[in-house]
Amino acid sequence: MRYDLINLSTVMNPDPKLGGLSFFEGTRDIPFEIKRLYCIFKAEQETHRGFRAHKTSSQLLFCPYGSVQVLLDDGKKKEKILLDEPQKGLIIYPNTWRELTWLKDDSVLCVAVSEYYNPSENTQDYQEFLQYLEENK
């Protein structure tokens, strides 16, 4: 299974009313240059998304608000990762299937991506994913 859990840098303000700040810097804190960033928001609890694998791009997923469960699958083994703290980051490398489940209403999931958008670089069919893995051992 090709992934890394990382801690995003976090600074808490001495005044609790001002909250905290979590951040990362591309190529310093993550192993790729960021070419795209998107956020998924206003999703209801038990929303399921993802259902895909990327052939060439790596991604950093983090949940600045709420709770999202990520199911990772390398074709042989499955593992669940919980993103429920703003300083928790999950780097997913190419050829890893992912499924996302919102565990709380209005959770926000942000994704930093190593490549520009290219729909032909991912598969949304699990059987095609398994076949691609078999052909590219």
Go through each PLM region and give its residues.
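Well-ordered alpha/beta subsegment
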Residues: E85-L90, N95-W102
